């Protein structure tokens, strides 16, 4: 160990002057304690699905740290990060994360542990910590595998919905204000029933 050289992130000029040495130490202190964002993989998810509020994920950073000798320091899991859901008021698109998803963990300037679900009034930070990995949020949808269930909005002003297991619509009515509905090549508006005699009927029962 005596003849090993600690590489670290010291520059050739870091020891050339008192100013350079001080700049080196200050820069390293900042780099050690200020977290901004890092790519992560989801290892566990607490998600309630449709009808439930957005939940939390456990994630593991995908970029490892290295020590002064250049050795890899395995990353540790980060727990209970609130995950992003596309929502406005009571309307939302529910696509909850699952283990194996890749996303981005972003870290807050101050301790946000006192913020509760649905809170609308500001609160004091839970502590004096700054830019900590303990105050992270998860934003999903980066570098993932091709989807199998999806809604595709095209530039030709059409929308394609692909769902191999079927589609369920929970609504008292479905309104198509104009146009037609085509099912298996048959028009809802213009289809005909062969072999029928004319007459009058009431509403379907």
Q: Where do the model's predicted regions map?
A:
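Hydrophobic packing positions characteristic
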Residues: 2-168
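Intrinsic-disorder/coil detector with helix-boundary
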Residues: 2-5, 12, 16-19, 164-205
């Amino acid at each position: 160990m005596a003849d090993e050289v600690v590489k670290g992130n010291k520059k050739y000029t870091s020891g050339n002057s008192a100013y350079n040495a001080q700049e080196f130490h200050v820069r390293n202190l900042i780099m050690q304690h200020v977290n901004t964002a890092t790519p992560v993989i989801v290892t566990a998810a607490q998600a309630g699905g449709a009808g439930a509020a957005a939940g939390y994920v456990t994630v593991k950073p995908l970029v490892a740290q290295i020590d002064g000798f250049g050795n890899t320091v395995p990353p540790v899991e980060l727990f209970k990060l609130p995950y992003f859901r596309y929502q406005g008021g009571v309307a939302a698109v529910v696509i909850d994360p699952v283990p194996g998803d890749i996303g981005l963990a972003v870290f807050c300037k101050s301790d946000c542990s006192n913020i509760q679900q649905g809170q609308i009034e500001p609160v004091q930070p839970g502590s004096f910590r700054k830019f900590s990995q303990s105050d992270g949020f998860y934003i999903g949808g980066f570098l993932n595998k091709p989807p199998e269930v999806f809604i595709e909005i095209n530039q030709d002003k059409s929308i394609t919905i692909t769902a191999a297991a079927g589609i369920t619509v929970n609504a008292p009515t479905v309104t198509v204000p104009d146009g037609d509905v085509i099912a298996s090549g048959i028009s809802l508006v213009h289809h005909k029933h062969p072999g029928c005699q004319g007459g009058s009927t009431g509403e379907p029962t």
